Curated annotation (Swiss-Prot):
This is Small ribosomal subunit protein uS13. Part of the 30S ribosomal subunit. Forms a loose heterodimer with protein S19. Forms two bridges to the 50S subunit in the 70S ribosome. NCBIfam families: uS13_bact. GO terms for molecular function: rRNA binding; structural constituent of ribosome; tRNA binding. PANTHER family: 30S RIBOSOMAL PROTEIN S13/40S RIBOSOMAL PROTEIN S18, SMALL RIBOSOMAL SUBUNIT PROTEIN US13M. Keywords: Ribonucleoprotein, Ribosomal protein, RNA-binding, rRNA-binding, tRNA-binding. GO terms for cellular component: cytosol; small ribosomal subunit. The lineage of its organism: Bacteria, Bacillati, Actinomycetota, Actinomycetes, Mycobacteriales. It holds the Pfam family Ribosomal_S13. Residues 95-124 are annotated as: Disordered.
């Protein structure tokens, strides 16, 4: 099993898909990495040589911000928005959708489960 930037890549998946298991790498970025390193995107992870793994590791560590570094940067950006008190920061602080989605209905993922209000009756 190939290990890149602290993530074990699945053995039986194609490289194009396996690289997406790393936080910060999607399909497009995965294809860019494979093209830059000269590795076939249809090759399986288990078929990689040690040299190819080394080339991939060096490319990713040298050119991209992934995994822990990227997570820390995103958290720092959110913290900064909360501290300066901008609209997005207020939405983060209140646990509401940040990017303008409706909240009268839906938004349950961000708001959490419904809380029933005592004494509220349905009007007929």
């Amino acid at each position: 099993m190939a290990r890149l930037v602290g993530v074990d890549l699945p053995r039986d998946k194609r490289m194009e898909i396996a690289l997406t298991y790393i936080y910060g790498i999607g399909r497009t970025r995965s294809n860019e990495i494979l093209a830059a390193t000269g590795i076939d995107k249809n090759m399986r992870t288990k078929d990689l040589t040690d040299d190819q793994v080394t080339v991939l590791r060096d490319y990713i560590e040298g050119n991209l911000k992934v995994e822990g570094d990227l997570r820390r940067e995103v958290q720092a950006d959110i913290r900064r928005k909360i501290e300066i008190g901008c609209y997005q920061g207020l939405r983060h602080r209140r646990g509401l959708p940040v990017r303008g989605q409706r909240t009268k209905t839906n938004a349950r993922t961000r708001k959490g489960p419904k809380r029933t209000i005592a004494g509220k009756k349905k009007a007929r």
